[in-house]
From Swiss-Prot:
Superkingdom of the source species: Bacteria
Naturally occurring in which organism (per UniProt): Bacillus subtilis (strain 168)
Keyword set includes Flavoprotein: no
Key words of the record: Sporulation
Taxonomy of the source species: Bacteria, Bacillati, Bacillota, Bacilli, Bacillales
UniProt protein name: Small, acid-soluble spore protein G
Biased composition range(s): Basic and acidic residues: 1-16
Expression triggers: Expression is GerE and sigma K-dependent.
Region span, Disordered: 1-48
Length: 48
């Protein structure tokens, strides 16, 4: 249970970051939205 809760918190944070990025570069982000970009975003989020 605790693991799922932790995962949900991380997903919410990633979603919030994605919203901020999309607000400024919606068209660009959509065209470059790949698994690699998501992996980079998660790694940066983890360092913070």
């Amino acid at each position: 249970m605790s693991e799922n809760r932790h995962e949900n918190e991380e997903n919410r944070r990633d979603a919030a970051v994605a919203k901020v990025q999309n607000s400024g570069n919606a068209k660009v982000v959509v065209s470059v939205n790949t698994d690699q970009d998501q992996a980079q975003a998660q790694s940066q989020d983890g360092e913070d």
